[in-house]
Amino acid sequence: MGKTLAEKIFSEHVGRDVKAGEIVLARVDIAMAQDGTGPLMINEFRELGFKEVKVPKAFLFIDHASPSPRKELSNSQKMMREFGKEMGVKVFDAGDGISHQILAEKYVKPGDLVAGADSHTCTAGGLGAFGTGMGSTDVAIIFGLGQNWFKVPETIKVVVNGKLQDGVYAKDIILEIARILGSDGATYKALEFHGSCIENMNVEDRLTISNMAVEVGAKAGLMPSDEKTREFLKKMGREEDFRELKADPDAVYETEIEIDATTLEPLVSLPHYVDNVRKVSEVEKEKIKIDQVFIGTCTNGRLQDLEIALKILEKHGKHPDVRLIVGPASRKVYMDALEKGIIKKFVELGAAVIPPGCGPCVGIHMGVLGDGERVLSTQNRNFKGRMGNPNAEIYLASPATAAATAVTGYITDPRRFI
């Protein structure tokens, strides 16, 4: 009997054939924590009596409150830097960028098992790795032992065929999946992506889809590793990390869903649940006023996302009543955007370009909303209070829809600007 991608990766990391439903002890290739979870992880690591870090690649990321907006957070970040020096763990600091983007650029390989004290570690699935979020204690154990127990998940096969029409993007695909499955429809399962649309999709778009697998409850969102993966790794200067990795043709899935990409329209997730998804063309008729537009995050803060948004805004300009915030996902994205003149153009259009990091998305700083305000963001979550104010409303959409909304001042279908 064939194996799913999840079963293949766990079999390699356990050292024997394993199947969905088994509880296994597996070695981990990459472990990480960020500044919200890192201090907890470090305290647990010390309390458990560990003296050295045994996971092959261990990282700490200061990205959530970066640069630090208050002294309490500064002290927590200081602890992380000191731990990094003591244990030989690389610390990515203010301005370096968001953990998931950096891991994709520099470290994640197809077939890796990646565990992070951050729920969006599933982003690694875009490169054919099993990335999953875990609690700080579990990650502390991985730091200290290089392994942990896992339950090999059942897999939902998601088949996306056809070609996306102009104005429709990977973000719309994952919002459609959220609409179909609901916010808990894949709890403790893996999503595995197939179909002609996925095969023709670059890794940047695959990362967007894998990033939001957790928003339907999934432990991981797994893409095949193929020539598109090789192209991405070559672009990142590490083609040697490539290996082809796909599920077996006779793999057994818990269930299967099919999506026809050709029929998809731009979608928007309305407050306060990610699965509260509607067509932008319908919502546009309601003329929902938007106060702030945020283009960035680990979901949609890559170079191509900024380029898509700029193309619309450059032609049509920003509405004077909209605050536009742009956040490149990493230092590399920021530098590439600088070299291409993208940052300069955003600034000239009236945008606030912020350092690479998570700040607005997690409601810590650089974009906290006022009471009664509405934001349209390219991020991955819109539950009440996510961006720092429970009395505000968060709408989720693609960079193109975000840009079109910044042009008009209300939620707008981007297809009329393309």
From Swiss-Prot:
Catalytic activity: (2R,3S)-3-isopropylmalate = (2S)-2-isopropylmalate
Biological processes, Gene Ontology terms: L-leucine biosynthetic process
SUPFAM superfamilies named among the record's database cross-references: Aconitase iron-sulfur domain (SSF53732)
Pathway connected to this protein: Amino-acid biosynthesis; L-leucine biosynthesis; L-leucine from 3-methyl-2-oxobutanoate: step 2/4
Enzyme class of the recorded protein, top EC level: lyase
Binding sites annotated in the UniProt record for [4Fe-4S] cluster: 298, 358, 361
Stored CDD domains: IPMI
Cofactor note: Binds 1 [4Fe-4S] cluster per subunit.
Highest taxon above the source species: Bacteria
Cofactor: [4Fe-4S] cluster
Stored Gene3D superfamilies: Aconitase, domain 3
GO MF annotations in UniProt: 3-isopropylmalate dehydratase activity; 4 iron, 4 sulfur cluster binding; metal ion binding
EC number of the protein: 4.2.1.33
Pfam families: Aconitase (PF00330)
Assigned keywords, A-Z: 4Fe-4S, Amino-acid biosynthesis, Branched-chain amino acid biosynthesis, Iron, Iron-sulfur, Leucine biosynthesis, Lyase, Metal-binding
Subunit structure: Heterodimer of LeuC and LeuD.
Function: Catalyzes the isomerization between 2-isopropylmalate and 3-isopropylmalate, via the formation of 2-isopropylmaleate.
HAMAP family xrefs: LeuC_type2 (MF_01027)
Family: Belongs to the aconitase/IPM isomerase family. LeuC type 2 subfamily.
Protein name: 3-isopropylmalate dehydratase large subunit 1
